[in-house]
Amino acid sequence: MQEIVIPLKEKSYKVFLGELPEIELKQKALIISDSIVAGLHLSYLLKRLKALEVRVCVIESGEKYKNFHSLERILNNAFEMQLNRHSLMIALGGGVISDMVGFASSIYFRGIDFINIPTTLLAQVDASVGGKTGINTPYGKNLIGSFHQPKAVYIDLAFLKTLEKREFQAGVAEIIKMAVCFDKNLVERLEMKDLKDCLEEVIFQSVNIKAQVVMQDEKEQNIRAGLNYGHTFGHAIEKETDYERFLHGEAIAIGMRMANDLALSLGMLTLKEYERIENLLEKFDLIFHYKIIDIQKFYERLFLDKKSENKTIKFILPKGIGAFEVASHIPKETILKVLEKWH
């Protein structure tokens, strides 16, 4: 069992990488999972969990269910089983479940503990660590949420055996995101090696990158912004396609390519660096056909991104390999020229 400690000002916790251990709790626990994950992994968790009382809440699977209705169901279950300030919630699932449970636990009784048990690659390397929580609204993705760190995170690679290839590749997109912005050595490892031969090491390295970033910038005031590479465009893509055509990681892969187009046009990437990232995405089948329906509407959606300030869009753009820059005040014409390539 490998451990990564994340020491923060208000709350420190550990990320455990290895077989899920027995979890003994002296309080009530509400497990929240989705309809697919519950059928695959709930019994595995229940065999390893001992608590004063356990209840299970199952939410429909999919990004479009990351909404107020699902949040209300989670909270109603918490009230019905009379969770108190010493009780906790357990998120068993991917990024959607992690985000919703984190948010629900942050507002229930003004904040109770929760444990993350991520079952997708995307959630293991990104969503389950760092304390960003939230739900989607008709206006955009993750526009309502909070920073609420988990009590602990348990990453068990056995969960990944049931993942469809598409879900797995979506998680790889988030690994590439972190590598391009923070760690050129990880980029080289992904380029040179078969991921099957070094998966545990890559997951550990990715979580460690995320942990180091969160330790330096828990509330996303500066360096943590790099974790949003591809997300300004990606969230607009998800909204335009009603969260149904692409998985989150797939939309982010497209968003990274759009960001690369913008970075290339601004001279932040050389053509060689641009092609290197393209080739890495292609290696993991993360090149998708996407056509913007209405360029002006898509452009306007970019302003709904949480990073936008004073009617200015902020983009996280790669600056070479292993670094990034927050770029703002980019002329509208420059952005539209990039979007035209995708129209």
Curated annotation (Swiss-Prot):
Catalytic activity: 7-phospho-2-dehydro-3-deoxy-D-arabino-heptonate = 3-dehydroquinate + phosphate
UniProt: Zn(2+) binding residues: 174, 231, 248
EC numbers for this chain: 4.2.3.4
Domain of life: Bacteria
Gene Ontology CC: cytoplasm
Entry annotated with the keyword Transmembrane helix: no
Pathway(s): Metabolic intermediate biosynthesis; chorismate biosynthesis; chorismate from D-erythrose 4-phosphate and phosphoenolpyruvate: step 2/7
Cofactor: Co(2+); Zn(2+); NAD(+)
CDD domains xrefs: DHQS
Gene3D superfamilies per the UniProt record, alphabetical: 3.40.50.1970, Dehydroquinate synthase-like - alpha domain
Annotated binding of NAD(+), by residue: 61-66, 95-99, 119-120, 132, 141, 159-162
Keyword presence, GTP-binding: no
Coiled coil: none
InterPro entries xref list: Dehydroquinate_synthase, DHQ_synth_AroB, DHQ_synth_fam, DHQS/DOIS_N, DHQS_C
Localization (cell): Cytoplasm
Role: Catalyzes the conversion of 3-deoxy-D-arabino-heptulosonate 7-phosphate (DAHP) to dehydroquinate (DHQ).
NCBIfam families: aroB
UniProt family annotation: Belongs to the sugar phosphate cyclases superfamily. Dehydroquinate synthase family.
Protein name per Swiss-Prot or TrEMBL: 3-dehydroquinate synthase
Organism for this UniProt entry: Helicobacter pylori (strain P12)
UniProt gene name: aroB
